[in-house]
Amino acid sequence: LGKGKGGGIVPEHSTGVKFVRGGNQFKPDNKPLKVGKNIVVIEPEGFCPYCNKFREDVSNNYAGNIPLSYRKASNLEGLSIKTPTWATPTILFLENGSEVFGYQGYLTPKEFYKALGFFKLGDSEAYRVAFNEGTDARFCKEYEIFKNTPDGIFIDKLSGKPLFDTRDRFVSRSGWLSFTRPVEGSVYEKPDNSYGMRRTEIRSVSSDIHLGHVFDDGPKGMPRYCINATVLEFVPRGGV
């Protein structure tokens, strides 16, 4: 962190959290971390190759709606932390200022999103779909909400990255959200031979969660991406 031109306030890395000067050091304001769910990444004062790797692989690409902030181990005043913070990075998952759980050391994107999934989704249908290759019930509540949204984008429920566009949505009468294509580069395909069937699974590139399957019976010879609504969130166009 560096001193601002007026000697006053220095913003923390893209989090919007402001630092106020106290004595000879800048101390972060931890009040926002005491409200709701937050992710805190502990980094050292000096160079940390695995901290840099975590930023490059995970946090710089994270766009989810649970705030992610950075702190030094000496800047955790007012927070209830259980995990030792001598190893860096240490990733903490907080709720109302208290640690729910934490991890010492580097997490791969897959490990981070598995932890985030448990933190955000808990023991829910969305978690089962995302991480256990589950399937929404036909015409589930989320489907009924999302089938007639205004113009916009469906995003990954964990990473916040765009996945599908309402312009590519169509009514398949299948009971699941259906699209003719994903947002370019947002998903990848994987063979799925479970339950004695040959299908093509669709997974999110950013978080690696299970999204659904793609079939060849879409309108006018196009594909039909059959997608579980519980692992999506919706953002009106212009809000991504």
PLM features: residue spans?
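Low-complexity, glycine/serine/proline-rich disordered segments
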Residues: L1-D29
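Local sequence-structure signature of Cys/Sec-based thiol-disulfide redox active-site neighborhoods
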Residues: P28-G64, K147-F164
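Structural micro-motif
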Residues: K82-L92, R198-T200
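Solvent-exposed loop/turn segments at secondary-structure junctions
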Residues: E45-P49, S74-L76, E99, L107-P109, ...
